[in-house]
Amino acid sequence: NNVYGMQVLLEAMVRHHVDKIVFSSTAAVYGEPKRVPILEDDETNPTNTYGETKRTMEKMMKWVSRADGVRYVSLRYFNAAGALDDGSIGEDHHPETHLIPLILQVPLGKRDYITVFGDDYPTPDGTCLRDYIHVIDLADAHVLALEYLRKGGESNIFNLGNGKGFSVKEMIEAAKKATGKDIKVEMGARRAGDPAQLIASSEKARKVLGWQPRYTDVEQVIGTAWTWHQKHPDWYQD
């Protein structure tokens, strides 16, 4: 349980005089945004349970910071994606829920088609828009956030994204180019709680942390994931 786990962690930190924490949060805390790109001080109004738990965890850190002096950085990930360039480390979820691995399961022969959940959203092609950020860029941000706290930085929140949205259909087309293979698509109904678009403004992280994403081309991001999947066709079970 996210919330209970955070309670136990924060209590242990206070008890053992650990006064800094870098937290992996999520863009899901925003829910359906009133504007894009999203800024860190925009309203948070989650539309799913996951986002609500992360927002609650952020609030818990805020109160512990005030009461006990624990300083925190909350990194609000947008859509984490990709793998190490050499294909040694990648995504392995059971069941898989992330879009890029699900798309790549089709050219891998693990599924017959990818389902697109809804094509009637208020976006250019009717499918959801998301901002994809490579895992290496996320790792870089974590190191910078820790350095920021070690240098005395105050508690803070940062968005982590590339600042550009790609639709589900665009991601499928990019995957076709990255893999050189056709990908069959079937349409499905909308999923409850899916915002039409989530696109970050990460200017604050760039200015305050000095963060500079290295993977800004979505086809390149998908390409790193494809390399991992080709080397691990049965995931880490092989």
Labelled PLM ranges:
Residues 12, 27, 63, 144-148, ...:
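A generic secondary-structure signal
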Residues 13, 65, 172-176:
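Conserved hydrophobic residues forming the short capping helix/wall of the S-adenosyl-L-methionine
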Residues 21-23, 73-76, 131, 159-160:
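Structural signature of the Rossmann-like NAD(P)-dependent dehydrogenase/reductase core
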Residues 3-8, 14-15, 19-20, 28-79, ...:
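Catalytic helix-loop patch of NAD(P)-dependent Rossmann-fold dehydrogenases
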Residues 3-11, 136-139, 143:
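Conserved active-site region of classical short-chain dehydrogenase/reductase
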Residues 27, 33-35, 40-41, 47, ...:
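Generic secondary-structure boundary/loop-capping signal
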Residues 26-29, 82-85, 121, 165:
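Active-site proximal helix/loop that lines the substrate pocket
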Residues 102-238:
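C-terminal substrate-binding subdomain of Rossmann-fold SDR/epimerase-dehydratase oxidoreductases
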